[in-house]
């Protein structure tokens, strides 16, 4: 019985620290130092939430830049079903999916002169990626320019404006947030 009291005291102390103090402290510090990120990096226009800067959306029209394909089942870009397709590189089903995506992109982008960028036909590990390279966005310019009656130069400048450089120059590559880019396109129409 004597050994039970110190064990129970230690258990209750650690329960209080790890189950109460630590979560409350990290939540408070996150809200204080990084309020936008701690609340989901939501993109707002007025009182309306238009999306999150962290999760891709299913932009399908010709007047929008398209992101990476979603690997989530049933509903594209469903954050509650995050996860990759888990298809191995040697799986014939993956080859079929990529071939179908390439054919669809070629049909939607007949004026594109180079090969389809790889990130437009392969899903990310989370299945929710919202970023593509500026080169993949530029590949789609002829289709978007035609659908929105905008010049190639206007769209090139917009891509440059919404391109984000890596924190460390030699680690990573520049990316374009598709959600922010497409919302900027919608604002041009207003």
Curated annotation (Swiss-Prot):
Subunit structure: The system is composed of three essential subunits: KdpA, KdpB and KdpC.
Name by which UniProt lists this protein: Potassium-transporting ATPase KdpC subunit
Family: Belongs to the KdpC family.
Transmembrane residue ranges: 10-30
GO molecular function per UniProt: ATP binding; P-type potassium transmembrane transporter activity
Keyword Transferase: no
Naturally occurring in which organism (per UniProt): Escherichia coli O45:K1 (strain S88 / ExPEC)
Superkingdom to which the source organism belongs: Bacteria
Location, primary (coarse class): membrane
Pfam families per UniProt: KdpC
Purpose of the protein: Part of the high-affinity ATP-driven potassium transport (or Kdp) system, which catalyzes the hydrolysis of ATP coupled with the electrogenic transport of potassium into the cytoplasm. This subunit acts as a catalytic chaperone that increases the ATP-binding affinity of the ATP-hydrolyzing subunit KdpB by the formation of a transient KdpB/KdpC/ATP ternary complex.
Subcellular location per the Swiss-Prot or TrEMBL entry: Cell inner membrane
Keywords: ATP-binding, Cell inner membrane, Cell membrane, Ion transport, Membrane, Nucleotide-binding, Potassium, Potassium transport, Transmembrane, Transmembrane helix, Transport
InterPro entries: KdpC
Residues making up the signal peptide according to the UniProt record: none
Membrane topology: Single-pass membrane protein
GO cellular component, one term: plasma membrane
């Amino acid at each position: 019985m004597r050994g039970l009291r110190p064990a129970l005291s230690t258990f209750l102390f650690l329960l209080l620290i790890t189950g109460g103090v630590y979560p409350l402290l990290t939540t408070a510090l996150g809200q204080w130092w990084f309020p936008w990120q701690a609340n989901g990096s939501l993109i707002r226009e007025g009182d309306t939430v238009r999306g999150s800067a962290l999760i891709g959306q299913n932009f399908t029209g010709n007047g929008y830049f398209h992101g990476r394909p979603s690997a989530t089942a049933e509903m594209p870009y469903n954050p509650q079903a995050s996860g990759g397709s888990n298809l191995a590189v040697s799986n014939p089903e993956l080859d079929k999916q990529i071939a179908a995506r390439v054919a669809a992109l070629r049909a939607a982008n007949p004026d594109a002169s180079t090969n389809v960028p790889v990130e437009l036909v392969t899903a990310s590990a989370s299945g929710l990626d919202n970023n593509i390279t500026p080169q993949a966005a530029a590949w789609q310019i002829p289709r978007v320019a035609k659908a929105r009656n905008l010049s190639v130069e206007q769209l090139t400048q917009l891509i440059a404006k919404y391109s984000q450089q890596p924190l460390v120059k030699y680690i990573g590559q520049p990316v374009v947030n598709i959600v922010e880019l497409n919302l900027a396109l919608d604002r041009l129409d207003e």
